[in-house]
Amino acid sequence: MKGCLATMDKELWIERANDSLVKHFYEQQSDIEQREGFESKLTFGTAGIRGKFGLGEGRLNKFTIEKLALGLARYLNAQTNSPTIVIHYDIRHLSTEFAQIIANVLANHQITVYLPDTYKTTPELSFAVRNLNTTAGIMITASHNPKDYNGIKVYGSDGAQLSTDASELASRYIEEVGDPLQIDIPISKQNTSYIKPFPKSVTDDYMKHIQNMIGYIPKSDLQVVFTSLHGTSVPIVPELLQSLNFNQFNLVEAQCKPDPNFSSVQSANPEDHRAFDQAVELANKSHADLLISTDPDADRLGIAERDAHGHITYFNGNQIGALLLNYRIQQTSQLRHRLMIQSIVSSELTKSLARYNNVEYKEVLTGFKFIAQEIRQLDDHQNMIFAFEESYGFLSEPFVRDKDAVQIVPLIIKYASELKLYGKTLKDELEQIYQTVGRHEDTLFSHTLEGFEGKKKINAIMTKFRSNPPQEIQGLKVKAIEDYLTSEVYHLDKDTTSQINSPKSNVIRVLFDEGFIALRPSGTEPKIKLYVSLKCPNFDDVAQKINAMIFS
């Protein structure tokens, strides 16, 4: 009977394919991909919804977007009278169409919607929510995912992504909508009056905040190459740099045009060195010093440096975090009660740097919304000077409550320009940080373990560390095991336990005098990540051996 219902359901979807907006994507998919759309459901989680285009409740299409919008409309109307919302969207396939669908549904429920007439960055959305004092915000993006993906992120009135509790409540409203094919969305001219143009003054205010944060960029002969990887950071980043009287940059022209197919890159991800290939070519031709790339929605960025011999140094997220923290410490020396926030899987290097400079630090779960929650809870006397995640997400000043590559681009250029005046580079500065606080190094291993056996192995690895924690790993003596699922720390050296004041998450962190390793399974994919952050000789060899020991 269940198979018959699934077949009927599939037939109903195919009958509506012409109205779905995604017929072309569906027809390009394999039989397995098509079937997955009918055998699964999109779920609204803590980061919203992200998925492939296609037919069925497990795919993004006109009908599943209408379901999401209707659930959010009911959620917002249950939270407050006369709710307001701002919607932004990136350059991906169907981002504009999804934005209009959501705006129409929300307007149909007397929710005032601010909708721009062009694509915007994710940090601009966070800022706009705060600037316009709206009840919520929606960002339509799938970050650096492949071209056949899109997603919806929902933000609260503070400009941060919804908290875990708010996400769960919104998810219930969405699920209560039921079958997306049965939704009837009447559009009336009276209701479309709730859709308002997005005020240009908001963008101007955002730019002013960054200009005030930067002040000026000192004159040097620093040359920069910038690429948006076909995303949203052009034109806003070039306009911002020019407003700061910095014109010594070249754009990778082929990659600075919006392109939902990301035609010129294998991966539109600044973590991936291949994303810099065209930037490196241009840097070699123009003898540039600094290379910067942002991901498609401009919340994350990567940097590389070219020396006089044409050698390229790529910086990982933890190294960029250390450089930016170091610079912010220099910039804020007059402030008292300074605070840095980072995720629990980010480097020991930044914590050591904070301690050395008498800067308080706090660690939170992975996900920038947890950083935003920490910012919201700051005392009046505390000064947050920097926040970051090792996955290339950074925030210098909290007028935005999400990762913000747009404000970081001129900051890193200013830093590099100052160093250039003294004949130094970012690589030199990183080496100085190592000499000051020790050579803490970091790496990440990501394992995909498919199917039932893969899931079983992931569970077995996590269970082993919970029930039978090792006394030492590769000659490193284990001090403590932090289990964020049980909210407990087991101190092996004292044979005692203590509590972790944090939301629950399936993460285990093993602490040594030399640093830590962390294990973090994905909640949505058959993946598990191993983070290694240590100060020890032969780091690469030790990290490889730890990885082999755990996953052999």
From Swiss-Prot:
Q: How is the cofactor bound?
A: Binds 1 Mg(2+) ion per subunit.
User: Which keywords has UniProt assigned to this entry?
Assistant: Carbohydrate metabolism, Glucose metabolism, Isomerase, Magnesium, Metal-binding, Phosphoprotein
Q: In which pathway does it act?
A: Glycolipid metabolism; diglucosyl-diacylglycerol biosynthesis
- Keyword Isomerase on this protein? yes
Question: What catalytic activity is recorded?
Answer: alpha-D-glucose 1-phosphate = alpha-D-glucose 6-phosphate
UniProt EC number: 5.4.2.2
Q: Which residues form the active site?
A: 143
Database matches in InterPro entries: A-D-PHexomutase_a/b/a-I, A-D-PHexomutase_a/b/a-I/II/III, A-D-PHexomutase_a/b/a-II, A-D-PHexomutase_a/b/a-III, A-D-PHexomutase_C, A-D-PHexomutase_C_sf, A-D-PHexomutase_CS, Alpha-D-phosphohexomutase_SF
Any GO MF annotation of the entry: phosphopentomutase activity
**SUPFAM superfamilies xrefs:** Phosphoglucomutase, C-terminal domain, Phosphoglucomutase, first 3 domains
**Which domain of life, per UniProt?**
Bacteria
EC supergroup of this enzyme: isomerase
Entry annotated with the keyword Magnesium: yes
* Cofactor dependency: Mg(2+)
Q: Which GO terms describe its biological process?
A: enterobacterial common antigen biosynthetic process; glucose metabolic process; purine ribonucleoside salvage
| CDD domains reported in the protein's UniProt record | PGM2
Which residues hold Mg(2+)? 143, 295, 297, 299
Q: Which Gene3D superfamilies does the UniProt entry name for this protein? A: Alpha-D-Glucose-1,6-Bisphosphate, subunit A, domain 3, Alpha-D-phosphohexomutase, C-terminal domain
User: Could you tell me what this protein does?
Assistant: Catalyzes the interconversion between glucose-6-phosphate and alpha-glucose-1-phosphate. This is the first step in the biosynthesis of diglucosyl-diacylglycerol (Glc2-DAG), i.e. the predominant glycolipid found in the S.aureus membrane, which is also used as a membrane anchor for lipoteichoic acid (LTA).
Q: Which family does it belong to?
A: Belongs to the phosphohexose mutase family.
Q: What is this protein called?
A: Phosphoglucomutase
Q: Which organism is it from?
A: Staphylococcus aureus (strain NCTC 8325 / PS 47)
Classification lineage: Bacteria, Bacillati, Bacillota, Bacilli, Bacillales
Please state the gene responsible for encoding this protein.
pgcA
